[in-house]
Amino acid sequence: ALPILSKGDIHRGGRSVAKVELDNGTILYYKPHSLDKNIKYQELYNYLCRKTGISCRTVQYLSHDSYGWEEKIENIPCKNESEVEHYYFRMGIHLFLGYALGATDLHGENIIAHGEYPVIIDMETYPGYLKQQSEKDGSSVEEKINKSTEIKLANSVIHTGMLPVLTWGRGNRGVLISAMGTEEKIKTPFKLPVVKDDKTSDIHIEYEPVEMQIKECIVRLNDQVINAADYTECIIRGFCRAYMVTMADKKVEVMLSGFFDGRSRVVLRHTQQYAMYLMASFHPDYMKSRECRKALLNVIHKEGESSFMKEIHDYEIDSLLEMDIPCFEIDANSRSVYDGNGGEHKEYLPCTPYESWRMHMKQMSYSDMECQCDYIRLSMEMLKASDGKKKMFPTRIKGYDTDKERKIYSQIRKIVHRI
């Protein structure tokens, strides 16, 4: 017997990840896309690990043009303090690669803590699109600084998804999400439909906050859950070592450029939002006909939307009507965005992802490395502030030389506190 369990979101006509257990107990994951990028990433990551003097774990892949097989990686604890330190050093290397490639999806569900080895299991959004400032961005000095700040954050380590950020709300009402691992359950600040009294004649739906827990990225030392904030400097050491190797070794940049030979997934709308639209359309009032469901889903359209956005929204609605979560891709050498049905929507991007990445790489420097380290420290401080007694952020950050940089950092502080 081969027990098969569908995992993850459904895209492109019902395709999804599947967990397969073989007769001998081996567990594999079937993925409905090529795993060539996973193999490239592993080669690059292994190279940086060797250059920084640390070992790495090799994941077994079998990749084909339109699908692939991947071994199951177990969440297991570290055996000693040294392994914990090595884990976060390796996380620093992963964080650098996410930063260098513009990744935005390194959240807890995509990283597994396998002893001293953090393993990334989803590479669909590699490489991402790195925003660049245009002469048209803002007419006043303040507008230009605000736009520069926005782009600086969007292209920073914060935007990778690996570091702690507040989402789904602000201040004390926000939810802290990261790939650094926490035993605490996440409670949504909004209500979701929940089935009550299942399998009885009183079955009904109530709306209430939902609790969730991301377990696979939790780091443990034996039975003790580790607070990643205590290992911030290990993360920074791994990040800086990988950064400096990249600046000194041209082979790394060549290996990075190898990711820009095809397409990668881009997130135009959060999956959670699509899931809520889909769930709402399953209400009995709208399941009477396809037209009723479409009438509800038409709320995706916005008044006064451009013809370009109308095309995007039409695809999203059609995809949801087919019970799929909409998905989009960008091509490394095109300004277009492509939907899950193969449709091309031209001139979505101001420049190609490859051109944008080249500009991003040119901006790398020791000054930028220090700036990213400041962001890491700022973000990791959130994990120390859960008791409400400690300051959320340090009061003084060094490393800014010009008046413009100080103004930009002032704006960043305002944005971070506002978030």
Each PLM stretch: what is its role?
Residues 1-103, 117, 372:
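Conserved ATP-binding subdomain of kinase catalytic cores across diverse folds
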Residues 1-43, 118-119, 164-419:
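Regulatory N- and C-terminal appendages and interdomain linkers associated
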